[in-house]
Each structure stands twice: as C-alpha cells, then as structure tokens.
C-alpha cells in the first residue's frame, strides 16, 4: 500500500510594501507575484488587480488595501499593499494588516522622501520588527556612486529610527523591468524573496506565546466557584496552572481548576478558542470584564503610555470638530472602556478629524498592556479614533 504523501504546512509570514508615493510599491508587489509564480508556481496577480484595491472597514475605519499571496520554497507569504498614504497610516495603526516584516521601497532616482521617513517612523511606533529595503528604478540610474549614496542615505535614515540600518538587506532592482520579464531584473526579485526568507524570522505562533485571555464575562457556579469567559488571545491554559488576574484592580493570583467549552470539560484552552476558566478561591465580585487572565508575570498593568493614533474623519463617522489638549475620551482596550486624558506633542495645539498624531495618554485605571497593543478611542460608545501603544511610561 502506497504511503500518503506527507505535506508539511509551510510557515505563514505577513509582509507588506511601504514607502513614498510613486516610488513603485504596487509595481514591486506585481513583480513579486509575477516572478515568484513563474519560478515556484501559484496564481499570478497583475498590476491592475493590485492597484484596484478593495475598500475594507476595520473598527469603522475605511481602508483601501490589496492582499496578495505568494510562495517561496520555504514559506507562504501574505502581502499587503495600499494605494494611498492615508491607507498606510490607518492600516498600521489599527493593525488591520499586522506585519512580521516590511519591504521599504525607495526610488533610487529620488532617494528617501518625506513619506519614506514617515513610514519608517510608523513602523517603529507600531512595532513592525523587520525592514528590508528594495531600491527601485535602478535601471534609470547609470551612476554607480549615486546608487551608493542613496543606499547610504536610506541606511542612515533607518538607523535614526533604531532599525539596524548597517546590517539589514538592501536590494537594488527595477520592479518594472522585472515585471516586463527581463532576466537580470527578475533575478533581483528572487534575491528579495531570498532576503524575506532569511532575514525575517519565523513569527511565533499565537499558541506558543505566554497565556492571556481577555475577560468578557464572569459567572459564579454554585458549589464550584467563579468562572471567567473569553477568547484565548495567545498561549494555552491547562487545569492546575497558576494564573494572574491583571488590570483595573490590584493583580491577584489564582489557580485554574477547570476549562469548559460548549458545556464540555476540557484539560486545556488554546489560542483562538472561546472558553470558560474556573478559578480557585476567587469571588464573583473580585473579577470584572476588562481584566485579563494571564500566565504569572507575563503582563503588567499600566496607566500612562505614548501612542500613535489615527482620528476618524467626519466621513468615517468620526468627530466633525477638532479636539484639544485636556480631551477626555474613553480608551477601549480588548473588552472594556477606560477614561483617559491626553497630552499632545510640543507645538501641536489641536487635532483634526482625519489626522494622525503621537500622544501621551493617562488612564484613570490601570490596564494590562504591552507595546503594540491596539485600542479604539470612543465617545459615548461611538468610535472616533484608533491607536496603538508605542511605549509604556508608567
């Protein structure tokens, strides 16, 4: 009897193109699709399909994004490309497209431009861990020294924002020529794919991380104790594990004495599953929605943090008027709203609907958070903005 063919599922990695308008992000996306499907198989997406980005809504925010997929021998990639600068800002802040790494496209005819800098800053703020540079339009530059100069400028700019500018891969190519099928430029796309495979480490799967479950509901079951319910965000909780209840009140410790899913008793609850966790020695009134259940010591509660936020435009159902310092909205983290005050950067007097801005937020109650956590800004239950924790202050 023939053995079944063993097919290991390839690691899945999320990437995207970033960079200044008209530097060739969409052309590069099409070139990657074209060259990799030609070399390794798969379904090709052409420039027009990618450029015609469908509209999506993430937390009420309208974002135009193109998603394509491609394979290298080692991995499966999901790649996002956005048509407009505003779409990038919204995408990165809301985390609609979480990137394990980004391809920064810089036209060698221009060098780094204002949005090049802004996208690098955003990548730093929202926690994009790795950047690979694709210097585009190199077929249009005859002067070798000029290319070296642009590469040096890009590397310095990345170092300025704490990326390893001296060490990260820079590929000099031409997306258009590769798309037109010229072998020497197609080779550069394969070089880029090789850099993606080797420079961006395999992302940690949600299940391998430290256990955390945002609490949505609390019940007490006569004779058994208190049960908290929610969807496991990452990790695994097993019967007998020690856990901490973090946020809003003082952190308390407990032990998981049972895991339930669809009224069935289980030994464990895993990332992505909705389950109830029975807690030893915890009263119903000790726990509330908005806290998290977590592996001991894995996450801590904080009240003050620096953030990067996007304010919804009027058309997106946001505010019709600007806000000023002293603005006190609610910040919605995971499952609950907490009121907070804002501090605007030096020289910024007001923030208009449709803007993005860095601000420091101080909450009236501590929330379990780490850098990279997304939140919504709400006024009376209506979303008026989206943000991400860039740095914890206190």
UniProtKB/Swiss-Prot annotation:
Catalytic reaction list: GTP + H2O = GDP + phosphate + H(+)
Residue segments, region G2: 60-64
Keyword Metal-binding: yes
SUPFAM superfamilies membership: EF-Tu/eEF-1alpha/eIF2-gamma C-terminal domain, P-loop containing nucleoside triphosphate hydrolases, Translation proteins
EC class name: hydrolase
Region (G5): 174-176
Function: GTP hydrolase that promotes the GTP-dependent binding of aminoacyl-tRNA to the A-site of ribosomes during protein biosynthesis.
Protein name: Elongation factor Tu
GO CC, any one term: cytosol
Keywords of this entry: Cytoplasm, Elongation factor, GTP-binding, Hydrolase, Magnesium, Metal-binding, Nucleotide-binding, Protein biosynthesis
Binding site for Mg(2+): 26
Main location: cytoplasm
Species this chain originates from: Shewanella halifaxensis (strain HAW-EB4)
UniProt entry tagged with the keyword Magnesium: yes
G4 as annotated region, ranges: 136-139
Domain tr-type G: 10-204
